[in-house]
Design a protein with these regions (language model features):
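A contiguous active-site-proximal alpha/beta segment in oxidoreductase catalytic domains
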Residues: 98, 121-182
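Residue-level detector of anion-binding/catalytic polar loops
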Residues: 51, 113, 141
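Short hydrophobic segments within beta-strands
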Residues: 31-32, 56, 94, 145, ...
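Anionic-ligand binding region
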Residues: 186
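Acidic-histidine catalytic/liganding microenvironments
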Residues: 47-48, 70, 85-86, 137, ...
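Short, Asp-centered acidic motifs that coordinate Mg2+ and/or phosphate
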Residues: 54, 74, 89-90, 141, ...
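Beta-loop-alpha module in the N-terminal Rossmann-like domain of NAD(P)-dependent dehydrogenases
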Residues: 70-115, 119-133
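N-terminal Rossmann-like dinucleotide-binding module
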Residues: 2-70
């Protein structure tokens, strides 16, 4: 178990060095202030030091509460205000799924990068509209929130699978404990 702990510690150290060396070239906005956002996404953005300029929501009475909870961030109910700000390079969207497409297409039409929780749209026609909007805007980065797909384990697996010349199968299990601080084998 000591060996596993040393690997985890080494990984955390290297990850920390990499993250501190990387900087962001602009500000970002976040649309949505629901439970998933506040419990899962905002802590990750804080940990990664992603500079947020705006938090957008649909409720005027939440604006002062948001600004108190997130100092230095402007709370707004205006998506147009966010999208017209040239300093904002990308927008994170985590709202009701039925609104993902409408907000996502506006973000892409503004030329900004988009992170949107799944599902990004409801049907193939909307998906094609998103793809077309992305092309027209110069191909800004688009990421759909499929957490497991972005995990370090999956990135390593993709590299290994790319070297294979024959079809293969694999069985992948995710640990759901307090990794990396917990017991990586038993949690």
């Amino acid at each position: 178990m000591e060996y596993v702990k040393s690997i985890i510690d080494r990984y955390k150290h290297l990850r920390s060095l990499r993250q501190l060396g990387e900087g962001y070239r602009g500000m970002y906005a976040f649309v949505g202030i629901g439970n998933h956002s506040t419990s899962n996404l905002y802590p990750v953005l804080s940990y990664l030091h992603v500079p947020l300029k705006y938090i957008g929501c649909k409720s005027h009475d939440k604006l002062p509460l948001i600004e108190r909870a997130y100092p230095g961030v402007k709370a707004t109910t205006s998506l147009a205000e966010i999208l017209s700000d040239d300093e904002v390079k990308g927008v994170f969207v985590s709202i009701a799924p039925e609104a993902h497409f409408d907000i996502g297409i506006k973000v892409l039409e503004s030329g900004k990068a988009l992170f949107v929780e799944k599902p990004p749209c409801r049907n193939a026609q909307q998906l094609m509209q998103l793809a077309d909007a992305r092309k027209k805007a110069g191909n800004p980065t688009v990421v759909v929130g499929l957490q497991k797909r972005m995990s370090p384990a999956m990135q390593l697996l993709k590299k290994e699978l790319a070297r294979c010349s024959e079809p293969m199968t694999y069985n992948l299990r995710y640990l759901t404990g307090a990794y990396p601080e917990g017991d990586a084998l038993l949690d």
